[in-house]
């Protein structure tokens, strides 16, 4: 791992919040296209990938055109790439409404229909639609770099944690509504979603899962860092050790929280994310009856390409 990837920068909520709020709104524009895709349990179909430059939709297919949308945080633009060509929309000073109009014009030039809804979701006190959001916002390249660095580092750790799980696991990525980076492990165990929650949230909780992720926080909880929870929530979460010094159970939030400042001061922050996730899964095994044999070897591809199956089984089972 390079020195740059080893550098875990300090993150201050107040410094990043304006751009995080702006980007959260912008990614919902292309994010709406993922709702046209087949539903994957846990909303795995809406995940945005963390790329070397920013955030990107999966490959999307409409009648007559195949495309993806890349929010290039490090370049300050959005690239719509299709089989018939590409278009670039700059992310300079402006409003969400202005961006939405420019995006739809660029998409139309490639034969891509506009998103089927204009609604902005999961952002408290926001304008109802993209066209209604006329607040002038600035693009801050420094904040964009910090956002990408945090997402990239956290994704690296979460992917390492997630890799050995043998059950269903959507790819690690950003959920464009709540704008958190998420890794979830699922099992076939029907559950009863909370009736008071929005429909899309209820349908995310039809089966049991374990979630570990990263969040930039919000106005009600202005703290950047890792989070985790077990659905349904079991008893006995209080007073446990969560694999990393500084990780604590927050009963009010229903989350295990690992603040970024605590994480970056760990001897090995990458490994600390893995240990954090492992501790949460161990709690699911001990308190919620999750199977312990759903975890395979945590090794790289070279190991699995050269090690006989009987040796893999002997060492990891």
Where would I find each of the regions flagged by the language model?
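TerminUS-proximal long segments
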Residues: 1, 249-317
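Low-complexity, glycine/alanine/valine/leucine- and proline-rich hydrophobic stretches
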Residues: 207-257
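Intrinsically disordered, low-complexity linker/tail regions enriched in polar/charged residues
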Residues: 42, 196-198, 303-307
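Long, hydrophobic/aromatic-enriched structural stretches that serve as scaffold segments
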Residues: 48-126
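N-terminal ordered "arm"
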Residues: 2-66
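Short conserved micro-motifs at the rims of enzyme active sites and ligand-binding pockets
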Residues: 59-61, 237-243, 268-272
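Ser/Thr/Asn(+Pro)-rich, low-complexity disordered segments
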Residues: 65, 70, 98, 102, ...
């Amino acid at each position: 791992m390079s020195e740059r990837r080893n550098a875990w920068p300090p993150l201050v909520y107040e410094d990043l919040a304006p751009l995080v709020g702006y980007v959260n709104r912008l990614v919902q524009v292309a994010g709406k296209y993922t709702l046209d895709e087949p539903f994957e349990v846990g909303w795995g179909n809406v995940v945005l990938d963390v790329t070397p430059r920013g955030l990107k939709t999966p490959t999307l297919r409409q009648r007559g055109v195949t495309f993806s949308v890349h929010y290039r945080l490090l370049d300050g633009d959005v690239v719509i790439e299709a089989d018939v060509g590409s278009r670039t929309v700059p992310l300079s000073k402006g409003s969400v409404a202005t961006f939405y109009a420019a995006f739809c014009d660029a998409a139309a030039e490639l034969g891509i229909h506009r998103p089927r809804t204009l609604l902005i979701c999961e952002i408290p006190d926001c304008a109802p639609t993209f066209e209604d959001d006329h607040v002038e916002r600035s693009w801050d390249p420094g904040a964009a770099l910090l956002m990408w660095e945090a997402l990239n580092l956290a994704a690296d750790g979460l992917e390492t944690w997630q890799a050995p799980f043998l059950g269903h696991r959507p790819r690690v990525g950003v959920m464009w509504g709540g704008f958190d980076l998420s890794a979830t492990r699922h099992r076939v165990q029907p559950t009863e979603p909370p009736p008071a929650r929005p429909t899309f949230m209820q349908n995310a909780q039809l089966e049991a899962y374990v979630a570990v992720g990263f969040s930039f926080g919000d106005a009600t909880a202005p703290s950047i860092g890792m989070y985790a929870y077990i659905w349904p929530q079991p008893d006995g979460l209080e007073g446990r050790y969560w694999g990393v010094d500084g990780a604590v159970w927050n009963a009010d939030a229903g989350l295990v929280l690992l603040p970024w400042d605590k994480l970056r001061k760990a001897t090995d922050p990458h490994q600390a994310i893995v240990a954090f996730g492992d501790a949460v899964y161990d709690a699911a095994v001990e308190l919620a009856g999750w199977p312990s044999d759903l975890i395979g070897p945590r090794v790289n591809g070279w190991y699995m390409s050269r090690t006989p199956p009987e040796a893999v089984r002997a060492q990891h089972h």
